[in-house]
Amino acid sequence: MPLPTPDGKSGRNPLRMRLSWEWLAPRRRPATARSVLAGEASAEAARKTSQAPEEALEAGATEVTPAEEKPAEPEFPVAGDERAAAFFDLDNTVMQGASLFHFGRGLYKRKFFERRELTRFAWQQAYFRIAGTEDAGHIQDVRESALSIVKGHRVAELMSIGEEIYDEYLAGRIWSGTRALAQAHLDAGQRVWLVTAAPVETATIIARRLGLTGALGTVAESVGGVYTGRLVGEPLHGPAKAEAVRALAAAEELDLDRCAAYSDSHNDIPMLSLVGHPYAINPDTKLRKHAREHDWRLRDYRTGRKAVKIGIPAAAGVGALAGGTAAAVAIHRRRA
């Protein structure tokens, strides 16, 4: 049976699977206590990992490709506005495809886990892309499997491997247009954060390589530098992303009305709705419709045939956990 690609495609149609379609109707999820916890934990982690200005400046020296489109608002971003910042989703916004899938490839190559585990997570991602919504039972199953694989592994080990995997699989997948938008904010003296369901340490590697300020990502617990196999809250997805941005903005004394956010997914509408300058980047059908209805800015850096993204929860909520096996779920919640 052919494996799905990083974009969730395969040689056979997953819709032939026997499904119970009643639960597939999309539902907007409100913020829960766990999503608030996940957001606050991610914001705290992001602030800690971003407090290394010399390292960030060194990473920021990377050559940047000019923007592919002229900004629609020449006066934006506003130079010198210390209370403004920009928040970028990762998968299919900053980079093409699912970052965690590629981290998984790198760990599988290093015999970090078995082929059957890679196959299982790949099919889970494809399934959720086709389904177009989330099911608590399936998410819980993937979560437990992913966390069981990283349990007992050292954070430093997986961070080191993640650096190598970035060079092997991710560096060439960055959208130059989105990268230029991020650089415009940096050049204006603003801070720029990735906001992703990917593990926060994985996201931090990518942010550092791109010269960004830091990253908000899914937070997993570690004790003594070793993963415990538990998450702090829930994956940073949907409402949890909005909570993370809200918490970080409060801690950093940012004015969200002066901030910008960028995403490809309708699942990030809560985050996009928080800021004064929301942008739909390479948008899926639902986000494109919402953006047009609300007069949001759109950018599309895809060329040729546009990839149809049906079930973003796979790449974000569930895919982050599946890839979290691959890349190692991130940050440390130390216990006494």
Regions found by a protein language model. Give the residues of each.
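C-terminal cap/substrate-recognition subdomain and adjoining C-terminal extension
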Residues: M1-P77, D81-R83, S160, D167-A336
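Active-site neighborhood of HAD-like aspartate-dependent phosphohydrolases
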Residues: G60, P71-A131
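Residue-level signal for pocket-adjacent positions within structured domains
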Residues: D89, E144-S145, A215, V226
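A general boundary/transition motif marking the beginning of the first structured unit of a protein
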Residues: D91, E134, A146-V150, G233, ...
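A metal-dependent, Asp-based hydrolase signature
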Residues: S99-L100, F112-A184
